[in-house]
Regions:
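Hydrophobic ligand-binding cavity/cleft-lining segments
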Residues: 1-38
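A conserved amphipathic terminal alpha-helix motif
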Residues: 2, 105-137
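Residues at helix-coil transition
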Residues: 25-26, 70, 127, 134
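Hydrophobic-ligand binding "helix-grip"
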Residues: 38, 46-48, 53-101, 105-107
């Protein structure tokens, strides 16, 4: 049996849960902090994240919405370059705002480079999520 790895990032954002949820589930807002997309918060919806193509990568991440629990949990598949993973966002209201937990699971033992790249990328994306959420009214 192959054991997979998960990447987990947790940060408390000083914003109400509803604002964070909007930034996670509205396509134009997702584009501002993550990538261009055709996301819709509907279970079963197949969509793509699109970024600038690079050598050996067409810039497309194939995804499907798996879970939508408004203001609580969002999950979608994340398939690109041989990585078949699942991203789960969990939101919990705190006295200071919202605890945001992102887990990307499914990294195979030989996907160390992909794991490290995802860790770097999600740190940057969280910065963008914070910025976009701060700008919401």
């Amino acid at each position: 049996m192959t054991t997979t790895r998960s990447l987990v990032i947790e940060k408390e954002l000083p914003h109400p849960l509803e604002k964070v949820w909007r930034a996670l589930t509205q396509g134009p807002l997702i584009k501002e902090w993550l990538m261009d997309n055709d996301f819709q918060p509907v279970v079963g919806h197949k969509f793509n994240f699109r970024s600038t193509p690079m050598p050996n990568w067409n810039g497309v991440i194939d995804s499907e919405v798996l879970i939508v629990e408004p203001n609580k949990k969002l999950s979608y598949s994340w398939s690109s370059l041989g990585l078949q993973s699942v991203v789960v966002w969990t939101l919990v209201a705190t006295s200071g705002g919202t605890l945001v937990r992102m887990e990307q699971s499914g990294f195979q033992p030989d996907q160390t480079r992909e794991y490290q790249g995802a860790n770097y990328g999600w740190q940057k994306f969280f910065e963008g999520l914070q910025r976009v959420t701060a700008g919401l009214t």
